[in-house]
């Protein structure tokens, strides 16, 4: 996002709500973020998409490969768009704009932050300010031993109580070479899961949709 553009200009908040759902895609610091471009392309086929990336996730995301119509917001934008009292606050404007938020991949670190209520970057500030009458999906991605760690179970229970919907990880050979559960679900699965939720309760173009958030915990 260029600093010369206002938050409202990039989000189109001065215009009527579109017929397509507004999806805010976010990536945190996992090697699975290499699939973020694929996620952006899949979601942009049926939704209006904006993207958020943490500093760590940018190690894995090729920004030049993202669809040209998708604006990617980073932590730097949070500060560059605010100069004085009364200016738009990016994480609040993004929260207002989005009908749905999807965090894929969700790293162990960002999961812990959300469960603990921390808000030290753009992504976690959006989640802390999120209106939980609107759906929020997460697709975790981490090493098997991190996934099986007792802290992970506690953190998943906490976000489950918020109404955050889980797209469970899968078992496969991980980037580190280990074999086990913890790999992010395939982009096609994440896309179809969110799209199905939208179809269950069609978008109301006069207001943000209210899609029931699942409360699923992993079987492991």
Swiss-Prot record:
* Effect caused by changing residue 178 to N: No effect on the activity
Q: Relate the induction remark in this record.
A: Induced by dark.
Positions with a binding annotation for N-[(R)-4-phosphopantothenoyl]-L-cysteine = 143, 173, 175, 184
MF terms in GO: FMN binding; phosphopantothenoylcysteine decarboxylase activity
Q: Key word Nucleus present in the record?
A: yes
**Predominant location:** nucleus
Task: Provide the Gene Ontology terms for cellular component.
Answer: nucleus; phosphopantothenoylcysteine decarboxylase complex
According to UniProt, the reaction catalysed is:
N-[(R)-4-phosphopantothenoyl]-L-cysteine + H(+) = (R)-4'-phosphopantetheine + CO2
How the cofactor binds, per note? Binds 1 FMN per subunit.
Q: GO annotations under biological process?
A: coenzyme A biosynthetic process; protein homotrimerization; regulation of cell growth; response to salt stress
State the source organism's domain of life.
Answer: Eukaryota
Kindly state which keywords UniProt assigns to this record, in alphabetical order.
Coenzyme A biosynthesis, Decarboxylase, Flavoprotein, FMN, Growth regulation, Lyase, Nucleus, Stress response
Annotated positions binding FMN: 29-31, 54-56, 107-110, 141
The record's tissue-specificity note reads: Expressed in root meristem, shoot apical meristem (SAM), intercalary meristem, floral meristem, embryo and tip of the coleoptile before true leaf emergence.
- Family of this protein: Belongs to the HFCD (homooligomeric flavin containing Cys decarboxylase) superfamily.
Per its record, how is this protein called by name? Phosphopantothenoylcysteine decarboxylase
Q: Which organism is it from?
A: Oryza sativa subsp. japonica (Rice)
Could you tell me the gene encoding this protein? HAL3
């Amino acid at each position: 996002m260029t600093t010369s553009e206002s938050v409202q200009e990039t989000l189109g908040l001065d215009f009527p709500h579109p017929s397509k759902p507004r999806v805010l895609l976010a990536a945190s610091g996992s090697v699975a973020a290499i699939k973020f471009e694929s996620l952006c392309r899949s979601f942009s086929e049926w939704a209006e998409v904006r993207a958020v990336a943490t500093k760590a996730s940018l190690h894995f995301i090729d920004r030049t490969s993202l669809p040209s119509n998708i604006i990617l917001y980073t932590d730097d934008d949070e500060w560059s768009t605010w100069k004085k009292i009364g200016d738009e606050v990016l994480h609040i404007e993004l929260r207002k704009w989005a009908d749905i938020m999807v965090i894929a991949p969700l790293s162990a670190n960002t999961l812990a932050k959300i469960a603990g209520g921390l808000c030290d970057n753009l992504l976690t500030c959006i989640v802390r300010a999120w209106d939980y009458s609107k759906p929020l999906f997460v697709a975790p991605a981490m090493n098997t031993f991190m996934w099986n760690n007792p802290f992970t179970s506690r953190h998943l229970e906490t976000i489950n109580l918020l109404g955050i919907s889980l797209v469970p990880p899968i078992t496969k050979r991980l980037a580190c070479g280990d074999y086990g559960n913890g790999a992010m679900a395939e982009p096609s699965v994440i896309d179809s899961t969110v799209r199905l939720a939208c179809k269950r309760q069609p978008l109301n173009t006069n207001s943000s949709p209210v899609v029931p958030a699942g409360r699923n915990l992993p079987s492991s």
